[in-house]
Amino acid sequence: MAAFARMVKGQVRNYSAPLDMAIPASKQKYIPSSGSYPKGFLVSGTHVGVKASNTKFPDLALISSETPCSAAAVFTTNKFQAAPVQVSKKTLESRQGQGIRSVVINSGCANAVTGKGGLEDAVSMGKKVDECNGLSEPSTIVMSTGVIGQRLPISKILNKIPTAHENLASTHDAWLTTARAICTTDTFPKLLSRTFVLPSSPGRTYSLAGMTKGAGMIHPNMATLLGVLCTDAPIDPSALQSLLTHAVSRSFNSISVDGDTSTNDTVAILANGAAGGAPISSPASDDYTAMQDILTSFAQSLSQLVVRDGEGATKFVTVRVQNSPDYESARLIASTIARSPLVKTALYGRDANWGRILCAIGYTQGVAPGTVVPERTSVSFKPVDGSPVLKLLVNGEPEQVDEERASVILQEEDLEIVVDLGGGEKGEQGLGGEEAVYWFCDFSHEYVTINGDYRT
């Protein structure tokens, strides 16, 4: 048995982060070679050695604005909220979403379920950053990620925060290094940026950047994993909170890797207004509507990178539930399918076992009465190459499935599952009803290996 354990821990992993942190060739395509970053934001990634085994890689991220920001965040609903979650919520509440200057993040230790001492550690991290910024009031959001139930090596972190502050920069390399600093079992840093315009200022260009981490313990409930977004657009705090909540509900709250909701889940956004223009404040304004679409689309792209880096994952799966009487029922059904171990393992095995999908639909809890009617439910696979859908079930009646074509479809990395609650031709034409989309990955042997020796 001991020999077997040594063999497992020494084996070559195809999908998890290599010991030298080199980005796998298959994931290189997700790494941006340049970016359009918001004005007035500076970032750095610094090595601390939070985990003793980490002797050289960055594990402390610092994101700072040269001017005070409006800020908003959504946090985990896990009852065991980590110390940084509790501290950051208090900071945002006391500041009413105004005057925030920085976000500091350590990887390697979650600082969760660590008692009074853990709370003191989280406070001290934020306070140290504030001191570096010459501030006396709490103005920093704190995040941590890693192993639960262990105290931070807080002295090491506090000693390196001034170094992180000195190294702040606005270059693409700095942003990429910062994104790498928040990774744990991730195989690649997740960083995106884009420019946009608003209806009130068509000649003014704004920028939006975001980084996220996560590969396991991913299933949302108000927020998921860690994410930081920054924009130089001017947005009032109350509007920023509603914009983020909407965006997260349709992005970070619509992904699943393994069905576990972390103790540390936090997604935050900072808006410093450095690009000028009139502040976005009223939900009735054209600028608000445009910003909602921009932020939601951006958050979806960012959150999908987490699924593509799911621990041991070999597939990126979109499940689209359409023709539902309401959005929430469609979302619940999509979520149930996405977290079904039987669905996920069938996809890994390239098995077109649509009965597992139907089973998940049938046991979904909380949907509106009359949402799921077997006689009008249809399920199909939609290939990524644009070829016709492969019908599996139509109006509750099984189709004669072309197993050979199904196998070809399931060999692809990307796949879409379409569930039509209205049935048949009506659903295919997209007539009527609400639609929800969820993104998830498969379960492989590698997932068990990664999580079986996570702490070692």
Swiss-Prot record:
It is an enzyme of class 2 (transferase). It catalyses: N(2)-acetyl-L-ornithine + L-glutamate = N-acetyl-L-glutamate + L-ornithine; L-glutamate + acetyl-CoA = N-acetyl-L-glutamate + CoA + H(+). GO terms for cellular component: mitochondrial matrix. The record marks T145, G146 as: Involved in the stabilization of negative charge on the oxyanion by the formation of the oxyanion hole. Its EC number is 2.3.1.35, 2.3.1.1. The active site is at T224. The alpha and beta chains are autoproteolytically processed from a single precursor protein within the mitochondrion. The record marks A223, T224 as: Cleavage. HAMAP family: ArgJ (MF_01106). This is Arginine biosynthesis bifunctional protein ArgJ, mitochondrial. The lineage of its organism: Eukaryota, Fungi, Dikarya, Ascomycota, Pezizomycotina.
